[in-house]
């Protein structure tokens, strides 16, 4: 039995594009690695001062915390602190990074596999320490993910590509993927798309011709700008259709634009 722990930096995930994240799917993602979840911690900020003054705000925040708890996550709440900087401005701060790192290190003795939910590069040393102790560490994040952190983990899951992790805004059937092959001479590419929650649940045969792609900002599509989608690992959103030969292709493709909170 592979014993797993989940450690989610909620503030980072929500702030960087994970608003509306389905916590049940996070658990399913770990279970798809043939692991049994022993620990599931969600680290969140709590602004007690504001909640005391704003009943509406308090109600919404409590409903959100209750929803996370219903998915069997243990909540670790970090109180928001307020202080004045040198210019007299009031600054708010609630950083749960240290709490998450300490808990992960202490609880890792009884775990084989850890899913870290954050794009914060400050967790680089935590990941390396856990790996040096023989643990497999995977990463789940959205936008603004530290490249150093992403390269250090054993497997990286982009939250935008995990099926069902985020709610569909308009119940659209559009897919998301990344370009992994580009033929500049013939102007086509192949996209890789997640088909499930397992590490290898990926199909990489989705054909995309440059003529089926449009930049979201309206600028002309060139070989160079099309190729940059691969080098910059941009997420591409598209409709998937079956060709007459039974293969699949992407049409009405464009850059995916996440909704930031």
What do the PLM-derived regions correspond to, one by one?
Residues 1-93, 121, 136, 144:
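Domain-level signal for Mg2+-assisted phosphodiester chemistry and nucleotide/NA-binding surfaces
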Residues 110-144:
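Active-site histidine-anchored catalytic micro-motif
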Residues 151-175:
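C-terminal helix of von Willebrand factor
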Residues 171-187:
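Structural detector for short beta-strands of small beta-barrel domains
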Residues 185-194, 204, 251:
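Short aromatic-glycine-enriched beta-strand elements
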Residues 198-217, 252:
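A short macromolecule-binding patch
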Residues 213-237:
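Short nucleic-acid-contacting surface segments enriched for D/E, G, S/T with interspersed K/R
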Residues 241-261:
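OB-fold/S1-family single-stranded nucleic acid-binding modules
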